[in-house]
């Protein structure tokens, strides 16, 4: 369900400076609440990022990362873990070539170089790591392992997998150290937790293999609590959040659906898993361009940019507003598709309307239909307690910042030049 941009991201990291990454200031504190930027939800997080306006992020090549004054850049850490119990001390035949820690040498340099590259950008960018390791580690360890609830009921109960998993998480956090970074823990996993049952009763290996979390319950809830607590211990200036999957709402066309109730249920689950002590919660609109889904998979995933019919952006923002207010943490859009009306609906050039809905512009309504001009919706995002939007391709053949005709870069430059939209209005 996820695209792991291992090769592309690794090459980008190799182009970054090798100087040490630095930190700026203190961690925002639990819950992402109010700060000097105002009394609105999320202002403390933006304070920590050095801004008061909604941020724009990107994932892509080193060229894309510097094509506009982006506020943050993100990258996946994925592909599976080292085969030994603890992180490799040297990269070679004895260490899995798919482990992120050996995309550069010595082990861990990949993350350091990524942070350094973000810090040396002009203007300076905040690095964001999407930690997505359970699925591919389980696939490499358990014969026939399939994505889904087995990640919860099988992988998270496997002592061997979880020993390596926590050791790798600790290694990443120690690599970040005092630096400022955003940490996004396991997209999709928490959605599968919801499908599997109650996280406070679903078993997971926690303290039995992790000395940092001996006081945590041996449940999925304890696993999430443990990972966030480890951030506070080893990377105190990092900001962290789980992901909220709006799978019941993303394609909803029934106006009678209680969107707020669904969001509240997700919030309750995530809070039990430690989100109540996190800084932000991650949300997404889709993992692929709508044009791709329509042409290649014969699926209609278009959202109405006029918000007149369902599914719509307004419906999603209603869900996010209820989610953030129930959690007490702001949201961050992540991995937002880059397709636009000028694309030709072939590989790497699929249409979508996400960029143009958020920034304003000529937005595609369907794959073959005429585009409609819409105004920007940054104020609507602020009203839903959204910190900003990070754009990036969700698969190798999707529209990305290098193939979108410069649409994202041009709109980001105009947005940043205008001073952006204040979160606290």
Segments and roles (model prediction):
Residues 1-39:
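Ser/Thr-rich, Pro/Gly/Ala-heavy low-complexity intrinsically disordered linkers and tails
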Residues 37-92, 389:
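Boundary/entry segment of secreted carbohydrate-active catalytic domains
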Residues 54-55, 59-61, 126-127, 280-292, ...:
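Substrate-binding cleft of secreted/luminal carbohydrate-active enzymes
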Residues 63-69, 112-124, 174-178, 232-235, ...:
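Acidic (Asp/Glu)-rich catalytic clusters
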Residues 68-81, 262-306:
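Aromatic- and acid-rich polysaccharide-binding/catalytic face
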Residues 82-237:
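Substrate-binding cleft of extracellular glycoside hydrolase catalytic domains
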Residues 184-186, 212-260, 283, 327-341:
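Aromatic-lined carbohydrate-recognition surfaces of secreted/lumenal glycan-active proteins
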Residues 248-277, 343-350:
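Substrate-binding cleft/loops of secretory-pathway carbohydrate-active enzymes
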